[in-house]
Amino acid sequence: MLEQMGIAAKQASYKLAQLSSREKNRVLEKIADELEAQSEIILNANAQDVADARANGLSEAMLDRLALTPARLKGIADDVRQVCNLADPVGRVIDGGVLDSGLRLERRRVPLGVIGVIYEARPNVTVDVASLCLKTGNAVILRGGKETCRTNAATVAVIQDALKSCGLPAGAVQAIDNPDRALVSEMLRMDKYIDMLIPRGGAGLHKLCREQSTIPVITGGIGVCHIYVDESAEIAEALKVIVNAKTQRPSTCNTVETLLVNKNIADSFLPALSKQMAESGVTLHADAAALAQLQTGPAKVVAVKAEEYDDEFLSLDLNVKIVSDLDDAIAHIREHGTQHSDAILTRDMRNAQRFVNEVDSSAVYVNASTRFTDGGQFGLGAEVAVSTQKLHARGPMGLEALTTYKWIGIGDYTIRA
């Protein structure tokens, strides 16, 4: 089965690579329209997936990731339309010039070819990834989690119908609908057909892909994100950022999971934090120094376990640790961070500059929420993933991250001397 999917995807990629920007946008508009026109089919499939997931005891955080509503589905369709408005990187000349030999040389952006994406209970990923791949002239093979099997099948069927109505092969966007995990291992060895693999899931999936894949892998998306509250931070303003970073949508990878508080501001900051977190329904996991102060406040507080500093809660839980200074905060982030998104709240611009220079994450913020690490917020459109590695792509992966380049030499029957 996968062999045939790979062949179909590779053949489709050749056709997609020849499309103009206008033709690709026309396809995306058709997909967006059909997602709305066929919304009832997709939402009914999703309702069945959610019901099964709830019966199987999935956490509320995972159920939130899985669930589609009419508003969310409309938002997904609108995101596809936004991709139409983005500049197409394909065909763009990056650099070049004329050599001494007279050969005119240029480096031009081209599609990667076929993208493979493995992801969990995030039905929006199906459309986000498909739209970005199509915009950049790439075919895509999707393998969603078993929890979203019906939703993904319904969504991909709608996309394929839209493709065929535009004269394009259904092989441009395909989904593996068999939940058998053995197929993941088989997919990881499809380097004959797949040019880049993007896993979007937990640490176990990323480890599996790194160890078994014969395809280049882009890893990331695991967000143990930190906010360091410096001693010069403005408490009221800092709390607004923390509430946003923790509670706006706790199930996302750019949500803050650990708060590091400078010891010199702790006495005045922690009582205010407790009040705010109580109002927001957040449970605080505090180290010994913070626990002593937080226990007298209104927020629910428990003693932090050492392993929780490495946890991506994806829920209304927040680690709180008192640190001695900026060096202590940076050391903690280096030990426990996932190089996703980290922030400092401060009025001391020297400390801010040190934090930016010394915290080696894909996105680093000064006096801003970690929630900004998102393709839409960065002006990249819907993102295919957030990469926390350094080669090929880093941070939110938009259109350019789904391209490579080729060298093109144009001569007049020019030969090398």
Curated annotation (Swiss-Prot):
Pathway field: Amino-acid biosynthesis; L-proline biosynthesis; L-glutamate 5-semialdehyde from L-glutamate: step 2/2
Main location per the UniProt record: cytoplasm
Entry keywords, A to Z: Amino-acid biosynthesis, Cytoplasm, NADP, Oxidoreductase, Proline biosynthesis
Positions of transmembrane segments: none
Functional summary from the UniProt entry: Catalyzes the NADPH-dependent reduction of L-glutamate 5-phosphate into L-glutamate 5-semialdehyde and phosphate. The product spontaneously undergoes cyclization to form 1-pyrroline-5-carboxylate.
Enzyme class: oxidoreductase
Annotated organism of origin: Escherichia coli O7:K1 (strain IAI39 / ExPEC)
Catalysed reaction equations from the record: L-glutamate 5-semialdehyde + phosphate + NADP(+) = L-glutamyl 5-phosphate + NADPH + H(+)
Upper classification of the organism: Bacteria, Pseudomonadati, Pseudomonadota, Gammaproteobacteria, Enterobacterales
GO biological process: L-proline biosynthetic process
Protein name, as recorded: Gamma-glutamyl phosphate reductase
Molecular functions per Gene Ontology: glutamate-5-semialdehyde dehydrogenase activity; NADP binding
SUPFAM superfamilies from the UniProt entry: ALDH-like
Pfam families hit by this protein: Aldedh
Compartments, as annotated in UniProt: Cytoplasm
UniProt similarity note: Belongs to the gamma-glutamyl phosphate reductase family.
Top-level taxon of origin: Bacteria
GO cellular component: cytoplasm
EC number: 1.2.1.41
